[in-house]
């Protein structure tokens, strides 16, 4: 079975899409917010998606890994908070009204903290041929690629529909 984990699942849309479209996946969806997990559970049930839900702090993964997140995963996906606090004034009002601030914003002093924690987790828990898929703030793509390289990952950057560097695909570098 293909083991997949979605960090910062929110409403569960990514985890649900993967659970419904991959062949025999074992999908785990992680979020710190009990309210987000309740919404994700309801959405998964309504859409007949088999998913294990875990309440955990992405930033504490490496200090205390829950049993359901032990072992290796073939795919890690995450759309973590990535908007710097200083960008808040440029946000559309409808986004600010409908999304919790904790799901959107990161401190200007450490905008890549979630990515760093997930990459550190992946060093141990991503299978050798596994892949990490991130959504990222275009302002921080180069820094993310540097962090990935320092931890032994290659990073391919992909554009969104507006031509912005928005997605990063990381793979462990081969040891050859």
Predicted regions and their residues:
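Mobile active-site "lid"/loop adjacent to the S-adenosyl-L-methionine
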Residues: 82-113
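Short, well-ordered coil/turn elements that cap or connect secondary structure elements
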Residues: 22-24, 48, 99, 127, ...
């Amino acid at each position: 079975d293909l083991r997949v984990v979605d960090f910062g699942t929110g409403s569960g849309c990514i985890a649900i899409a993967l659970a419904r479209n991959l062949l025999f996946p074992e999908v785990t969806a992680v979020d710190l917010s009990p309210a987000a997990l309740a919404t994700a559970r309801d959405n998964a049930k309504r859409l007949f998606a088999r998913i294990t839900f875990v309440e955990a702090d992405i930033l504490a993964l490496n200090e205390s890994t829950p049993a359901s997140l032990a072992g290796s995963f073939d795919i890690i996906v995450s759309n973590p908070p990535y908007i710097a606090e200083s960008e808040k004034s440029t946000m559309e009002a409808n986004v600010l009204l409908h999304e919790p601030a904790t799901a959107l914003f990161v401190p200007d002093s450490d905008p890549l903290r979630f990515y760093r924690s997930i990459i550190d987790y992946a060093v141990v828990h991503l299978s050798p041929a596994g892949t990490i898929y991130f959504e990222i703030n275009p302002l921080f793509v180069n820094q993310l690629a540097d962090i990935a390289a320092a931890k032994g990952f290659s990073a391919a950057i992909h554009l969104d529909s507006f031509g912005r560097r928005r997605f990063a695909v990381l793979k462990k570098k081969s040891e050859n």
